[in-house]
Design a protein with these regions (language model features):
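Transmembrane alpha-helical segments of multi-pass membrane proteins
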Residues: 63-82, 135-150, 198-208
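Alpha-helical transmembrane segments of polytopic membrane proteins
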Residues: 31-46, 69-87, 101-119, 166-178, ...
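Juxtamembrane "helix-exit" motif on the non-cytosolic side of transmembrane helices
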Residues: 21-29, 84-98, 152-163, 212-222
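Alpha-helical transmembrane segments
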Residues: 6-22, 42-44, 72-83, 144
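Eukaryote-skewed repeat-based solenoidal scaffolds used as protein-protein interaction platforms
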Residues: 106, 110-113, 123-170, 194
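Membrane-interface helix-boundary motifs at transmembrane edges
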Residues: 2, 57-68, 126-139, 187-196
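Canonical alpha-helical transmembrane segments
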Residues: 44-60, 118-128, 178-187
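C-terminal transmembrane-bundle signature of multipass membrane proteins
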Residues: 4, 8, 12-24, 46-51, ...
Length: 262
C-alpha cells in the first residue's frame, strides 16, 4: 500500500509543486526567458517521470469518488459561468460594453461546446447513471475536448500577430495540454488509452495552467471579467486533472495464464 501511495503522489505532487513555484516566480517576472526555459525543462522532466511510473497504473478510469465528483462539479459550474458571461458580453451587454470578436463563428462554437462540456461534467458528478452507456459517455467526453480546441483557436485569432506575447505561450500550451489530457481521458473510456500519455499530458497541463493563470489572477487590473473567469476555470481544470491522476487505478497484476498467453 505504501508503494502504491508513493506512485500516486509522484503522479501529482511534483507537477503541483513545480506549477506553484513557476507561478510565483512569474508574478514579478512575467516575461522572463529564464523562467520559460525552466518551465520547458520541468515539462520535459515530468514527461520522463510519467514514462518511469506508467507501468504502475491501469488503462482505465476510477469510479466516481467524492474528490472526482467535487472537481467535476466545480469545472461544470465554471464552464456554465463562462458560457453565460460570453453570451452576455456578445449580445446582451450595453452596446458600448459589448466585446468585438474577430471570428464570430469560432466564438459561437467555443460557447456551444462550453455549454455541452458543462452538462457533461455536471452529469458525471451528479447523475452518472445517465452516462452508463459507454458510447454515450464517449460522445459526451469529446465535448470538453472540442471546447478546448475552439477556445485555443479563438484566443489564437484574438491575439493577432503576437499570440505568444505577455505569457501567451504558457496560455496556449496550457490549453493544448489540457485538451490532450481530455482526449487521453476519452481514449481511456474507449479502452484504447495509455497511462503514459494520460500522465504526461496531465502533469504538463497542471504546470502550464498554474504558471499562466495564477499570475493573471494576482495582477488582474488589465484583464477583463471573461479573461479572469477563464483563468479560474483552467485552474479548476488543473484541479480536476490532479484529482484524476491521483485516483488513476493501479495496474492489475497479470495472472500466470495471461503471462503464458502473452
Amino acid at each position: 500500500m505504501k508503494q502504491h501511495l508513493t506512485y500516486r503522489l509522484l503522479s501529482v505532487i511534483p507537477a503541483v509543486l513545480c506549477g506553484a513555484v513557476l507561478a510565483f516566480v512569474r508574478i514579478p517576472h512575467p516575461a522572463s526567458i529564464a523562467v520559460a526555459i525552466a518551465a520547458a525543462a520541468v515539462c520535459a522532466a515530468l514527461a520522463v517521470l510519467a514514462f518511469c511510473v506508467r507501468k504502475q497504473f491501469g488503462s482505465e478510469l476510477a469510479g466516481g469518488s467524492t474528490a472526482v465528483t467535487f472537481a467535476s462539479s466545480i469545472v461544470g459550474l465554471l464552464l456554465l459561468a463562462c458560457f453565460a458571461v460570453s453570451v452576455y458580453s456578445l449580445y446582451f451587454a450595453p452596446p458600448a460594453e459589448r466585446i468585438a470578436v474577430t471570428n464570430t463563428t469560432v466564438v459561437l462554437l467555443a460557447d456551444l461546446f462550453s455549454l455541452l462540456a458543462a452538462v457533461y461534467f455536471l452529469l458525471s458528478a451528479l447523475i452518472p447513471s445517465l452516462l452508463a452507456n459507454q458510447g454515450a459517455r464517449l460522445l459526451w467526453a469529446m465535448t470538453p475536448v472540442l471546447y478546448c480546441a475552439f477556445r485555443i483557436l479563438s484566443d489564437f485569432i484574438a491575439t493577432g500577430t503576437m499570440p505568444l506575447a505577455n505569457g501567451g505561450g504558457y496560455h496556449i500550451l496550457g490549453m493544448i495540454f489540457a485538451m490532450l489530457f481530455l482526449l487521453c481521458e476519452a481514449k481511456l473510456i474507449a479502452k484504447k488509452g495509455k497511462p503514459f500519455a494520460y500522465l504526461a499530458c496531465g502533469q504538463i497541463a497542471i504546470v502550464l495552467n498554474a504558471a499562466y493563470n495564477v499570475p493573471l489572477l494576482a495582477d488582474f487590473k488589465g484583464a477583463t471579467t471573461a479573461e479572469l473567469l477563464h483563468g479560474v476555470m483552467f485552474l479548476a481544470f488543473a484541479l480536476y486533472i490532479a484529482v484524476r491522476l491521483f485516483t488513476l487505478p493501479y495496474a492489475q497484476p497479470q495472472t500466470e495464464e495471461a503471462i503464458e498467453q502473452a
